[in-house]
Amino acid sequence: MAAQGEPQVQFKVVLVGDGGTGKTTFMKRHLTGEFEKEYVATLGVEVHTLVFHTNRGPIKFNVWDTAGQEKFGGLRDGYYIQAQCAIIMFDVTSRVTYKNVPSWHKDLVRVCENIPIVLCGNKVDVKDMKVKAKPILFHRKKNLQYYDISARSNYNFEKPFFWLARKLIGDPNLEFVAMPALAPPEVVMDPALAAQYEHDLEVAQTTALPDEEDDL
């Protein structure tokens, strides 16, 4: 029996992607309001508890922050077991992290079939983007949701959890009644840049998918 005020609804979400894409920063931004400027390879797994208040009551996400380093690959099945949803993250300033997205997706769906998955391109506050909206096709081919995000500016930070909450609860009218407490942005996301990215994504969504069998 949950204590009074404790969320009755909770979900396990696994956060995966290459090392250095900002997964741990993503979580710590929510929970402690700290942005990690120094990259420290995550050892093992940390479970972060994140509560969102919605018009359907509080929802708790138990976020498993998995190691992005391949040397920990043997442990990943254990991370994935009983996951109810997932976030795959890549770094828009690093093409290789996007090229590795299909591998993360394959590992994930091998253990967890038919769970809602969000693909996130992090670090969009950096103007020198290497991965643009038009070539980001993987989510369309695999029917995943996609968001540009930025830890440093808080841009779109709650969007992945908002989309997952609606999917998991099965209510398209679910709304957050309070935003999570985040630290003040370290940088300001240029509104014109954000508008351009959103426009580019909209255009990309209406572009026909290429015929080739390339995963990306």
UniProtKB/Swiss-Prot annotation:
Record-listed GTP binding positions: 17-24, 65-69, 122-125
Stretches the record annotates as Switch-II: 68-84
Annotated Gene Ontology cellular component terms: nucleus
Signal peptide residues on this chain, from the entry's feature table: none
Disulfide bridge partners, by residue number: none
Keyword set includes GTP-binding: yes
Matching CDD domains: Ran (cd00877)
Residues recorded with modification N-acetylalanine: 2
Keyword Ligase recorded: no
Glycyl lysine isopeptide (Lys-Gly) (interchain with G-Cter in SUMO2), cross-linked positions: 71
Superkingdom, taxonomy of origin: Eukaryota
PROSITE patterns the record matches: RAN
Catalytic activity: GTP + H2O = GDP + phosphate + H(+)
Subcellular location: Nucleus
GO BP terms in the entry: nucleocytoplasmic transport; protein transport
GO molecular function, one term: GTP binding
Cross-link (Glycyl lysine isopeptide (Lys-Gly) (interchain with G-Cter in ubiquitin)): 71
SMART domains: RAB (SM00175), RAN (SM00176), RAS (SM00173), RHO (SM00174)
Enzyme Commission code(s) on record: 3.6.5.-
Chain positions found as N6-acetyllysine: 60, 71, 99, 134, 159
Domain Small GTPase Ran-type: 7-171
InterPro entries to which the protein is assigned, alphabetical: P-loop_NTPase, Ran_GTPase, Small_GTP-bd, Small_GTPase
N6-succinyllysine, modified sites: 159
Family matches, as SUPFAM superfamilies: P-loop containing nucleoside triphosphate hydrolases
Main function: GTP-binding protein involved in nucleocytoplasmic transport. Required for the import of protein into the nucleus and also for RNA export. Involved in chromatin condensation and control of cell cycle.
Protein's recorded name: GTP-binding nuclear protein Ran, testis-specific isoform
Organism from which the protein derives: Mus musculus (Mouse)
Record lineage: Eukaryota, Metazoa, Chordata, Craniata, Vertebrata
